[in-house]
A protein has these predicted regions:
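A short, proline-enriched helix->beta-strand linker immediately N-terminal to the Walker B motif
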Residues: 161-165
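Catalytic Walker B motif of ABC-type/P-loop ATPase nucleotide-binding domains
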Residues: 167-170
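The feature captures the beta-strand-to-loop junction immediately N-terminal to the Walker
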Residues: 41-43
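Short coil-to-helix segment of the ABC ATPase nucleotide-binding domain corresponding to the Q-loop/switch region
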Residues: 102-110
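Helix-to-loop junction immediately C-terminal to a conserved catalytic motif
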Residues: 56
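Conserved ABC ATPase signature
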Residues: 142-146, 150-152
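Conserved ABC transporter NBD signature motif
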Residues: 64-72
């Protein structure tokens, strides 16, 4: 079943008076099925983060339309948009976006607090999430007291606590060491195996190889796609790196 669809997304930024407009996205179209794990790969400035922000309703396209479960995001306004984002989407960012004055517990529960979820239900949801991510002992700590990997696991807990239809991840391993990156990717694998739909923007071939499908973006356009099928993560990683090498050899920009 189709969960997300982007139709001919274009984004143009106007520069200062007299300057030439900057086209960040040039007619991007694709869809994501429920339960898929899709990665979008591209170099810095390729348009991948702009695309993610539009899919997340954090930015609006100059033209084109995004649908989630058949509902056009263009038709959702104001407070309804904030509620839609809070209830349907989960976010994992490179820099964690945790509130320093909130404990780990409070950071995780924030989406439920904003949704006015009853306290008993919040606690009921919290326990299995933090147990599965191994952060139960950290609940009363503040972000400054925990490691980068622990911060990102806290961010994942916050993303899944509201049981979103779609998790959007923007360079989630970018600020992590190799060990913490692998732990996070294993968590994404497990979430996907449990039926969670994920869309991840990354420049890392290793991170992308954990997805089931990879879309490649350059100069605001999708130019290639790889599907993992029954291949192992290692074999898919080799295919991704080979595809990137070929794209560079043919005049494309290295990722």
């Amino acid at each position: 079943m189709e969960l997300l669809r982007a139709e001919n997304i274009q984004k143009v930024y106007n520069t200062r008076a007299g300057g030439k407009p900057c086209r960040a996205l040039a007619g991007v179209s694709f869809s994501v099925e429920a339960g898929e794990f899709v990665a979008i790969m591209g170099a810095s400035g390729s348009g991948k983060s702009t695309l993610l922000n539009i899919l997340a309703t954090l930015d609006t396209p100059t033209s084109g339309e995004v649908f989630l479960e058949g509902q056009s995001m263009k038709q959702i306004k104001g407070k309804n948009l904030a509620a839609f984002r809070r209830e349907k989407l989960g976010f994992v960012f490179q820099d964690f976006n945790l509130l320093d004055t909130f404990t780990v517990r409070d950071n995780i529960l924030l989406p439920l607090v904003l949704s006015r979820t009853p306290l008993a239900e919040m606690e009921q949801r919290l326990k299995p999430v933090v147990a599965s991510l191994g952060i139960e002992p950290l609940l009363e700590h503040f972000p400054v007291e925990i490691s980068g990997g622990e911060k990102q696991r806290t961010a994942v807990a916050r993303a899944v606590i509201n049981e979103p239809r779609l998790i959007l991840a923007d360079e989630p391993t970018g600020a992590l060491d190799s060990r913490s990156s692998q732990q996070l990717l294993n968590i994404f694998d497990r979430l996907n195996e449990q039926g969670q739909t994920l869309l991840m923007v990354t420049h890392s071939s290793l991170a992308a190889s954990h997805a089931r499908r990879v879309l490649f973006i350059r100069d605001g356009k999708l130019f290639a796609e790889l599907c993992r099928g029954d291949q192992s993560q290692q074999v898919f990683y080799d295919r991704i790196t080979a595809s990137l090498s070929m794209a560079t050899h043919q005049g494309g920009e290295s990722l």
